[in-house]
Amino acid sequence: MDASHLLDQLRDSLGVHVDFSHLLLAFALLMARVLPPVILTPFLGGETVPNEVKLGLGFMLGMVLYPAITSQVAGVPASPVLFVALMLKELFIGLTLSFVVGIVFDAAQIAGNLVDTMSGTNQAQLMVPQIQQQVSLFSNLQIQLVTVVFLSLGGHHIVIQAFGESLERIPLDRYPTFAMAGSWALFNTVLRVYGDLFRIALALASPVLLATFVTDLALGLINRVAPQVQVFFVAMQIKPAVTVLIMFTSIHLILDRAVHEYGTMFGWVHQVLRLLE
């Protein structure tokens, strides 16, 4: 039995009645849409996972999503120019989804940096394996918290479902038409998501920011009443302790806020998909 016959049998078993080369081209387009989130978002791998594992995970996701593209395989062009254009389109969709899905994780890192700056602990650095970056102590804590919340909510399942929905709304062999509101609406939505990044960061950091502000105010009053007190050196001891205390007493508020913001993020994902359609 020759190789061509084996390929024909494999093609028939997959339910694909087109040339096998079209199937490979379609799968390459699918991988271009799937791999950016696998590579860039912490919960699907991020920088901590070896490239071989990320490629394997992307391949498995592609196999899971394969039934959604069976009707689109025949429409994939064999022309190199048209195929490259479709590949760029898939990369654009994948990168856009990666940006929207990763908004809460980026906001958590910014929130942690704000907390460390206000508490004076920003000189201490830790390596966060999810993003392979040196970040401050509370940035690390915030990133780990939102990652655990995301996985506990089954957010990774929702993201995979969003990929399936994207294949229905924007097939591999078709370009985005922006029929709903035009391309400017998509650009405006991405800008609003970017603005939400800082709003979420402030929301996650607000309990500690308020506590450190009150601490600074109290120390300022002490300095006015008793100038002989070395407030600067006192603050170096008090503010980190206050930050840790408030962080752990208000952690339920931070977790509730993270849950709420994930709902907002999932809404942004579906809105972006509708605008791309």
Language-model region placement:
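Hydrophobic alpha-helical segments and their helix-loop boundaries in membrane
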Residues: M1-E277
